[in-house]
Amino acid sequence: MEFIDNKTIEDFSRDGAVLCKGMFIDWLDKLRIGVDKLIENPSVRERSYTPDDGTAPFFQDLVNWDRIPEFKDFVFKSKLGFYASKLMKSKQSQFFHDHVLVKEPGSSIVTPWHQDKPYYCVDGAQSVSFWIALDDISKEGCLECIAGSHLSNVLHKPKRFNGNDLYENDNSEDVPDINSNRKDYKILSWDIKAGDAVAFDFRTLHGASENVNKNSRRRVFSARIVGDDAVFIDRKGK
């Protein structure tokens, strides 16, 4: 099956985000096993949030591909790099890191609007993150992306998900109040099935609501890739 055709590439270039249906369905079982192993044995980079209202937690951990065999198999044996190169229009793709995000049933934690690039020690125009659903997710609980925001040439101030600034003395622009002005933006979101992937540019503004499903987990494996023009950048203050 051809998951990436010319229209998919055009949509990604224009909007900075595109849904790729069924792209990683053959890897579901392996990635789910890897997520279970990670939750049982998280890394020192694990960052979880427990809501004050007593609802279920939001688990996060990243850069575990080299110690979770199932993740390592996915990175090296799937067509992840091939798909990334096509979307980025890059001759090659370089794996940057993995990121696991699990919102347990009914978790009230909201993922705030942000761009990924300001958090990273990498620069360049060619980038893609595959937000791979390991469970069915309704449009109301899915990732949301602001179409075209990757073309604004603005990198907004990165904040921790608790609202604190990530870097000291950062004078970059705050993320605009999108939720109060949703009609002013073209917001992309989808009803997605397990095995689907949302591919988005590191510069794309995106966020996600609480897990509105009180009976199902919202497990996501994200894989971040960079292209030919990637260079290291030292973002002071972290």
Describe each region flagged by the PLM.
Residues 139-205:
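Double-stranded beta-helix
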Residues 110-118, 145, 205-208, 223, ...:
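Histidine-centered catalytic micro-motifs
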Residues 90-91, 117, 133-143, 148-150:
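Active-site region of the double-stranded beta-helix
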Residues 1-14, 19-113, 119-121:
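Non-heme Fe(II)-dependent double-stranded beta-helix
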Residues 27, 104, 138, 152, ...:
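Feature marks short, surface-exposed loop/turn motifs that line or immediately flank catalytic pockets
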Residues 44-53, 156-161, 194-199, 203-238:
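Non-heme Fe(II)/2-oxoglutarate
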Residues 121-138, 224-227:
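Short, conserved beta-strand element in jelly-roll/cupin
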